[in-house]
A protein has these predicted regions:
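Active-site beta3 strand of CheY-like receiver
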Residues: 7, 50-60
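Active-site residues of response regulator receiver
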Residues: 10, 62, 90
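Receiver (REC) domain active-site loop signature in two-component systems and cognate sites
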Residues: 65
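Alpha4 helix (beta4-alpha4-beta5 surface) of REC/receiver domains from two-component response regulators
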Residues: 72, 93-110, 117
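Two-component/phosphorelay signaling modules centered on CheY-like receiver
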Residues: 8, 13-35
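Helix N-cap/capping motif at the beta->alpha junctions
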Residues: 35-48, 70
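Conserved phosphotransfer cores of two-component systems
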Residues: 48-54, 77-83, 104-105
Length: 119
């Protein structure tokens, strides 16, 4: 049976946990929430999810992370899971990163940290 998943990616553990708590309180209990603290871990989770026959319906990623940045991760994921919505979070306004994500990752939304629950 195909299960829907949401993937939250941020190098700060507290941020992914806060996202997970907000999502659990806002979405169907049928949707599984996965978390990753690096882009590399996120790619592994996506590959494992697809191998299991499940699907990622939404990716929420921080922009500024060590190693691979959020906009590069989202662009890679757009090639693997183009149907997934992609949201980028950042505490820093980097218009070049946002433009890159819009043009290369089909960015659905950009949210400034700290976010409001309505975001």
């Amino acid at each position: 049976m195909e299960r829907d998943k949401i993937l939250c990616v941020d190098d700060e553990e507290m941020v992914v946990e806060a996202l997970k708590i907000e999502l659990v309180n806002s979405i169907s209990s049928d949707i599984i929430i996965e978390t990753a603290t690096s882009a590399e871990e996120a790619l592994l989770i996506v590959n494992e999810t697809l191998k299991q026959g499940d699907r990622i319906i939404l990716v929420i990623s921080d922009q500024k992370m060590p190693g691979m940045t959020g906009e590069v991760l989202l662009a890679k994921l757009d090639k693997i899971i183009p149907q997934a919505l992609k949201i980028m979070l950042t505490g820093y306004t980097n218009l070049e990163a946002i433009q890159y994500a819009i043009n290369n990752a089909s960015l659905f939304r950009y949210i400034q940290k700290p976010w409001e629950q309505e975001d």
